[in-house]
Structure formats: C-alpha cells, structure tokens
Amino acid sequence: MINVSIAGIGGQGSVLAAKILAQAAEAKGWQVRTAETIGMAQRGGNVMSHVRMGNRGEVVHSPLPAKGSVDMIIALEPGEGARALPFLKKDGVLVVPKSGIAPTAVNPKAAEYDPQLLIEEMINKGIHVV
C-alpha cells in the first residue's frame, strides 16, 4: 500500500495532481481510492488530496489515510506542507518548494512568514524534506 497526499492552496492544482496520479496507478492495475479535503479552497484556503494505492491484489478499503501513515506528502506550498505533517509516517518524505504563496485572501497576516525558515525548522525536526 502506498499513500500519497498532496497539500496546497485553492487553485494550485492539488486535486488535479491527485487525479492524474490515481489514473496512472489505475492504468498499471493498482487499486486506487482518492479523497479531498477542500474547505475554503475557493478563497485561497487549504486543499488536501489523498491517493491510496494498493498493488495488484492489495485491497484499499478507505479513501482517507490515517494520521502517521502517508509515505509521501507533495506540498505545493511550504506552509501547507507543515500543516500536513501529522499525516506523514516517520520514514516518509515531504516534497516542498522553496518559495511560498501566502493565502492573503483568507488572512492578510499570513504573508508574514518565511518559507525558508519553515523548511529549515522541518529539516531540524528530522523530517526528510526534498
């Protein structure tokens, strides 16, 4: 079983990316379940998409992964990567960009964070950041 979560801000394409990943896995014969948590996405809020893939013969019962069970989080924005960390397993991988997009439509003060500092903090906590 492989669990991948894609975290981003509304409009970045996290739902589309999850659909593409799911279709690719299905084309290879994997059983796939997907789920999205969209919230205030239309206003620049967070979006979390989950793709759970079972190799041939492996049954995927639930579309939502348990916290601490995701193999890889693909973050389209560093702050959303940090928000998704409770889902990442201990030996999981976080893929995160070096620059951020502040969702100022929701919270004007959100622009006041340093993405590089946030990434350094995650690395210092032992998170495998790519």
Q: Which residues does each PLM region occupy?
A:
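Active-site cofactor/cluster-binding pocket
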Residues: 1-130
